[in-house]
Amino acid sequence: MKNSISLPESVQQILDRFQQHGYEAYVVGGCIRDVLLHQTPSDWDFCTSANPDEILQCFADCKTIAVGKAYGTICVNWKSVWYEITTFRTESEYADYRRPSQVTFTTSLYEDLKRRDFTINAMAYHPQIGILDPFDGKLDLEKRIIRCVGNPEDRFQEDALRILRALRFASAYACSLSQETNDAVFHHVNLLDSVAKERMCVEWTKLLCGSSCAVILQRYAAVVAHQFPTLQETIQNVPEWQAICERVAHVLPIPSIRWAAFCSVLGENAIGLLQQLRFSKQDQKNILRLVRLCQQPVLAEQSDLLRKMHQYGKEAVGDWLQMQLTSFSNQETVLQAIAQYKKIIADQICYTIKDMQICGNDLLAIGIPNGPAIGTCLNQLLEAVICGRVHNQRSELLQYAEAHYASSDTPNLMKY
């Protein structure tokens, strides 16, 4: 792996600003890891010998956020981009398995890197020096090993979320855990009970979207069972669990789709798992749509697809059909259904009430009473369009409504 990194101009300018003021500064952590893996970093983080007040002085001409100042972190807006800059520090006395009770600023980069979670995240870089890698993170990346910096027992007790982060990185980068890290995961799995559900949701989502999620979900089935008791019975059935893991790995790496594949065995009970992880109402809705669709057969009939699109939405049905390509035994039927779905989209075939060439006022005009009967009539007209009994044309729809609207003894139903 290379020892030099091409830095964005703005990142280099921040390093130069520190150097002009007489401080050490490096890009650090995940951005180094990503570059070595030939990936584009989502952000660039900095560490420096400057203390928080000195960081603020260096960037007095910039917008800054000092919410994390007590922990040594200042956010600096440079060229309209926010960057996180943290003073070299050591940590001690983790009281809640998350935050250090005591932070001590230091001028030692080595001490700062020593506090980090994994060797692959404990590297720093400066273009005049190269990659600083005191814990052989680059070698672990080459060997595809996730290894804690120092004693993994200590690292996991400092922040229990690191247990899931280890599995997430292994899933994302096709890695194995070092033996010591692996043993500590199983030994300290109970510590996950103390982690905020929202934080766990983020890590589980990234784990499920990793390229090696099937391997990790099977290898660490005990962790999954501890986190999600509703899956324990399924996990005990090894062939069934293996099939679910493979299904998750083969659908598109989109969070809602991966979660739906993961939860599909639970059916309606999936809502409990999603609520446990504090998913937003909208995310729960999107995932449950797919879970419910997964309980239904794939049919290549246009009317069946139109009904599903009306009930669950166009996007959900499209995602569901793609999921079936990896799990449905009759691939020919799935391919036919996908072709039919694409034709519906291309031809703009009606599948919702708002797509119909008629509205409630039109029904009022022909004598249908205001109230629930209007909605019922519109839904029945839509079903007639979906079934092909009437074309989606205003005159035909009005004629059909007049001919089929029930007598006054059943004012909310149409006669067929």
Enumerate the language-model features and the residues they cover.
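Catalytic cores of the polymerase beta-like nucleotidyltransferase superfamily
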Residues: M1-Y416
